[in-house]
Amino acid sequence: MTPQEVTRQFVTAINAHDVEGLTSLMTSDHRFIDSLGTVVEGREAMREGWTFYFSMVPDYRLDISRSFVAENGKAEAMLVGVASGSYWSNEIKRPDSSWSMPVAVRAVIRDDQVAEWQVYADNEPIREQMRTTSV
């Protein structure tokens, strides 16, 4: 598969909330880096991470408008688009909890799998909503 095909499949699995599909596309030493720089290492840790995130944001999706690939010794893709969803707590949608924001993602592809997935987005509005919104 080309790096574009791998990242396209990864985004498709994210939008389908297909945790098994996501983990099948990750290297065993996969690294996820969030917008605050927090690193989660390992496929199994990210299986738990995506499962938890999809329970908190059950309508999360990425709409990618552009992607670029550079192959300078390793295949790196940059994806640009919009992330959207709504915050749920205890399986209840929080009032006024829908959000949409620009997002960029850097992906490192190795052996037809995602070795690293780094998200660049301003998530402070979502974090603030989580701190202050009550059901």
PLM feature spans:
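A beta-strand edge to alpha-helix "cap/lid" segment located at domain peripheries
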Residues: 2-6, 15-16, 33, 47, ...
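Short, solvent-exposed secondary-structure junction/capping segments
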Residues: 11-12, 24-40
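Short helix-adjacent coil turns
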Residues: 17-21
